């Protein structure tokens, strides 16, 4: 490269470049690529100014040879190539005589005709990228930027190229020649890559064929190819003025950055409409369990055996009747379905050997409830593609629903402690290393805080139901199988307990795709009278099935017992996630662990024990209309767990959208609280994106109302 520079450039340029490098403590013999780049840049600056003069009338003219006596003044003052002190002297004198604003960085030229400084760039990369980097660095509206590349591309501020076509062509030809010369000596690759500091061996994932054509078609405006866009993105410097960047990206974009102040955000608008209804796959706070302690009956652990045993603990059966019909359904069919379950359970018991599974008779009421033969017949596309008015069904927009108080009660209930433990302490071997000791100590404390939590019961109940339903869906596709809803726990005294919540009857389940739906009817015991909050139960038909004797202060009193029956559906992918709801536990453990780590690093010792045992300390749990709620570490664990579990139980596209979009607003508000002076553009569009997700989902509506409480307190 050194030889190449010596042979290709004017000795004066080579000398100036050597001087410039030494001024910055760099060695031209070692940093040969940089040496060549500086020479090239100097030569372009000189060529830019060559032959350009201003005549006595102040017009710009080009004189290549001619009368040496003509009264001509050089159009450009060359600043590049002078030593720093001299260069700044020239800049200062120009500013003093012309009144032009003094630049922060040394420019390359001054144009006496346009009265502006010029920054010349020569790049081996994309001109866009280099232009942006220059613009970001100098951050001055007044300095004109003109970038040339070795491939003949150029870019200048406001597409004002200063010079005539021919002068620019001369520069481009010279750059192209330098590139050819370097390439012929095998120097070009190293030179090209050195600007970017990338590896010489370049491995790229090649995109070809259709994908390549699609990629080229889908580029933003002003990009000719995918490479060109890739390079632009790779070189994008994150700091700097957003407006400028946006206006360079596209002529159509003009973003006004608005300051985000305490008065800027408004609360989210929650929808009006009838109150929202319960949409979980099984009852939560309203569930009633029929339980057996220390089960030791024959076939213990086989769901059907366990269920029959649990049913026997209830003595208050009555003739069932409908007390809250389903608005749209054929309610007598739900009643008949329950009677059929009772009758078929009786049949099972009467058999000599109880079977492990029970398939229900395909009665008219079950066929109706499970939507048998209701699906429209599928026709091969080939047979109907010529139909002229082929179209998809019109589907109705979902009806907006308002937030109802029951979902907050459900959440509060999920945070509470029950009197049973729902997860076992893992059987883990002896600790070997000190870190393992800390880890198992944390896990034990954590387990103690959450093992009795109602949210943990919901996890185990969900895992059981989804596993059983997925199994049955694969093993008995055509059968209406009866699936008991069971969970297991330990009492305070450590006794094992098996609980029955009710039954599921599954419909036909030929599930080819992840999203194919299996319909099921759920029948769940409850002591909740549905007439207290009828809107919560609009999807259910509720029967009264008996009376349960409950201990009260004055002895035992009968309480009416209800059965919530509804048709529901799920899919393989939903059951897969339902089976993995236990993942909420490690997810939460990580959150708690980062809190402990933060404490420990402040105190410079492990704070696990103090963290869990210091009962006087309170932690922020969340924001309510009353302000920031605080509680013990156990309460924090249980609240975070309940949130995580509800995200799983009430998973929906509305929740996905709300979480993603509201997070952006949350980050902006946090930045404001941290005095980072955030700015936004199109805040209205962000609000629209958030509010588009607030339709009818109870959990999303509750989160939105919490978000509003947070906004109120955060901006006080």
Curated annotation (Swiss-Prot):
Post-translational modification (record): Phosphorylated on serines and threonines by host kinases, including human casein kinase II.
Pfam families: Flu_PA
Name by which UniProt lists this protein: Polymerase acidic protein
Residues that coordinate or bind Mn(2+) 2: 80, 108
InterPro entries xrefs: INFV_PA, PA/PA-X, PA/PA-X_sf
Localization in the cell: Host cytoplasm; Host nucleus
GO molecular function per UniProt: endonuclease activity; metal ion binding; RNA binding
Similarity comment: family membership: Belongs to the influenza viruses PA family.
Residue span of motif Nuclear localization signal 2 (NLS2): 184-247
Superkingdom assignment: Viruses
A single GO cellular-component term on record: host cell nucleus
Cofactor descriptive note: Binds 2 manganese ions per subunit.
Residues at which Mn(2+) 1 binds: 41, 108, 119-120
Chief place where the protein resides: host cell
Motif Nuclear localization signal 1 (NLS1) per record, residues: 124-139
EC class name: hydrolase
Quaternary organization: Influenza RNA polymerase is composed of three subunits: PB1, PB2 and PA. Interacts (via C-terminus) with PB1 (via N-terminus).
Swiss-Prot/TrEMBL keywords: Cap snatching, Endonuclease, Eukaryotic host gene expression shutoff by virus, Eukaryotic host transcription shutoff by virus, Host cytoplasm, Host gene expression shutoff by virus, Host nucleus, Host-virus interaction, Hydrolase, Inhibition of host RNA polymerase II by virus, Manganese, Metal-binding, Nuclease, Phosphoprotein
Keyword Metal-binding assigned: yes
